[in-house]
C-alpha cells in the first residue's frame, strides 16, 4: 500500500513535527526550480528549495529530495526471511481467512518496541544496510533502512547536493547517539538480532559504536545492477531514458569524486553502479532508479598535489570529448561500456553509450544551473552545527574537515568552462 501524504497547496514544504536533534531529508511539495533554505528547530530537513544567492545564517538547513516510488509494494528477494511466519499472525481464527497485509515505509514516529525483524541488505562496494521491519496493532508492516558509516558526514553532504539537483534519493533523517531514540533503536536491534543471528548481532553492535545512523525510506522491488535482465531492462520500454538517467548520476559522481559506481574516471574500480536500486516502474517524478548512498571525496585542496591535478585533468578530458561531439561515443564512455559488458557478459551497444553520454551532458548542465560556490560553503556550515554532541572520536568534525571546498569549486569551474 502506498504511503499517502496530504500537502497544503500554499506551502512549499510539509509541516514537520519537532524531532529533537534529527536530520530529515524530506519531499518537497512544490516543483519550483528556485531554491531557498528555511528553518526547522533542531532539525535539518532536506527540501527542494535552496537559495543560490543566500542561505539563512542559522544552525539548521533544509534540503530536498525526490523519493522513490512506493507503488506496488510487495515482498521481494530483499524482504525479510520470516515474512511468511508473520503473515500467519494475520489469520482470522473464525473463518481461516487472511487479513490483507499492508506494507509501507515511514521513517517518522517509529515505535522501536514494535520491531519484529532485522536483516542485511548489501548494495555493493562494502555498503551494508539494515532492513528493519515493524508490526503495529493494525497488522500493518513498516519497513525502513538503517545505515551507519565512517563517512556519514560526507554522505549527508552529498545527499544535500543531490536533493538540490532533484536527483532520486529516498527520504531520510539523521539520528545521533545523544538522542533518546538512539537508545531505543539500539536496544531493539540488539534484542531482536540476539535471538536470531549471532553474526548479525555482532555486526549491529559494532555499527552502533559509530554514533550516527541514517534512517531511510525503503521501496521494495528494486534490483541491484548485477541482478538485472540487462537486455530487457535497457532495450525495452523506457530503455533510453534509463540510460540517460544513469548518465545524470554519473555527472554528479564526477562532481563529487564518488568512485563507488563505475570505472569512468577512476582506476581500479571493481563495482558498477553500486548503491543504486533499479525499478521497473518509475516514481512520480519519472525516475527508474534510486540513489541509496553517495559520497563526496575531496582530494587535498592544494593544486600542486599530483592526485589533485590528475583528477582535474581527467575531468577536463572527458568533458571536452562529450561536449565537442555529443552524438559520437567518446573513448572514455566506450572503455566504461566495454568494462561493464566484460564483467557481466552482456552486450551493451555503442548507442547505449551515447545515451549515457547525453545524460552526463544534461547532468553537468543541471549542476551548473543549480549549484554555486555559496551553496557549497553554506551547506557545509549548516552541517557543522547540526549535531548536538560529536562522537568521542570527533567523527563529525573530521568528516567536515575532509570536505575541501576549493576542490569542489575547481570542479564546478571546470564544468562551467565546457558548458
UniProtKB/Swiss-Prot annotation:
Keyword Kinase carried by entry: yes
Keyword Nucleus listed: no
Pfam family of the protein (one): Act-Frag_cataly
Annotated spans, Disordered: 73-94
Matching InterPro entries: Actin-fragmin_kin_cat_dom (IPR015275), Kinase-like_dom_sf (IPR011009), PI3/4_kinase_cat_sf (IPR036940), Put_AFK (IPR037469)
Any one of the GO BP annotations: sexual reproduction
GO function term, MF aspect, one: kinase activity
Keywords linked to the UniProt accession: Kinase, Transferase
Family to which the UniProt record says this protein belongs: Belongs to the protein kinase superfamily. AFK Ser/Thr protein kinase family.
UniProt name for this protein: Putative actin-fragmin kinase DDB_G0279609
Amino acid at each position: 500500500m502506498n504511503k499517502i501524504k496530504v500537502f497544503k497547496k500554499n506551502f512549499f514544504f510539509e509541516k514537520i513535527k519537532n524531532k529533537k536533534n534529527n536530520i530529515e531529508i524530506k519531499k518537497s511539495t512544490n516543483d519550483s526550480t528556485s531554491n531557498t533554505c528555511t528553518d526547522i528547530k533542531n532539525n535539518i530537513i532536506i527540501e527542494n528549495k535552496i537559495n543560490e544567492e543566500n542561505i539563512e545564517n542559522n544552525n539548521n538547513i533544509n534540503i530536498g529530495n525526490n523519493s522513490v516510488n512506493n507503488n506496488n509494494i510487495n515482498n521481494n528477494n530483499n524482504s525479510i526471511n520470516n515474512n511468511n511466519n508473520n503473515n500467519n499472525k494475520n489469520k482470522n481464527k473464525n473463518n481461516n481467512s487472511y487479513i490483507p497485509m499492508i506494507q509501507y515505509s515511514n521513517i517518522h514516529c517509529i515505535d522501536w518496541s514494535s520491531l519484529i525483524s532485522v536483516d542485511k541488505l548489501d548494495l555493493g562496494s562494502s555498503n551494508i544496510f539494515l532492513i528493519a521491519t515493524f508490526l503495529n496493532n493494525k497488522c500493518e508492516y513498516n519497513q525502513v533502512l538503517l545505515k551507519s558509516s565512517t563517512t556519514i558526514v560526507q554522505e549527508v553532504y552529498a545527499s544535500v547536493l543531490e536533493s538540490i539537483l532533484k536527483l532520486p534519493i529516498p527520504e531520510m533523517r539523521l539520528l545521533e547517539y545523544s538522542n533518546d531514540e538512539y537508545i531505543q533503536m539500539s536496544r531493539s536491534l540488539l534484542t531482536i538480532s540476539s535471538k536470531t543471528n549471532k553474526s548479525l548481532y555482532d555486526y549491529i553492535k559494532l555499527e552502533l559504536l559509530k554514533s550516527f545512523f541514517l534512517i531511510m525510506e525503503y521501496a521494495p522491488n528494486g534490483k541491484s545492477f548485477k541482478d538485472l535482465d540487462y537486455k530487457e531492462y535497457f532495450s525495452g520500454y523506457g530503455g533510453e531514458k534509463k540510460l540517460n538517467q544513469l548518465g545524470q548520476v554519473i555527472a554528479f559522481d564526477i562532481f563529487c569524486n564518488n568512485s563507488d559506481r563505475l570505472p569512468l574516471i577512476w582506476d581500479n574500480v571493481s563495482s558498477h553502479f553500486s548503491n543504486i536500486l533499479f525499478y521497473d516502474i518509475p516514481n512520480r517524478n519519472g525516475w527508474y532508479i534510486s540513489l541509496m548512498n553517495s559520497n563526496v571525496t575531496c582530494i587535498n585542496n592544494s593544486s600542486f598535489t599530483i592526485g589533485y591535478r590528475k583528477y582535474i585533468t581527467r575531468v577536463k578530458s572527458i568533458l571536452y570529448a562529450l561536449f565537442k561531439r555529443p552524438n559520437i561515443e567518446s573513448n572514455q564512455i566506450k572503455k566504461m561500456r566495454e568494462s561493464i559488458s566484460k564483467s557481466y557478459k552482456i552486450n551493451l551497444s555503442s548507442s547505449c553509450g551515447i545515451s549515457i553520454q547525453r545524460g552526463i551532458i544534461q547532468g553537468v548542465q543541471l549542476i551548473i544551473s543549480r549549484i554555486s560556490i555559496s551553496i557549497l560553503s553554506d551547506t557545509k556550515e549548516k552541517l557543522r552545527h547540526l549535531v548536538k554532541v560529536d562522537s568521542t572520536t570527533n567523527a563529525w568534525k573530521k568528516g567536515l574537515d575532509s570536505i575541501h571546498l576549493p576542490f569542489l569549486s575547481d570542479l564546478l569551474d571546470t564544468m562551467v568552462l565546457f558548458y
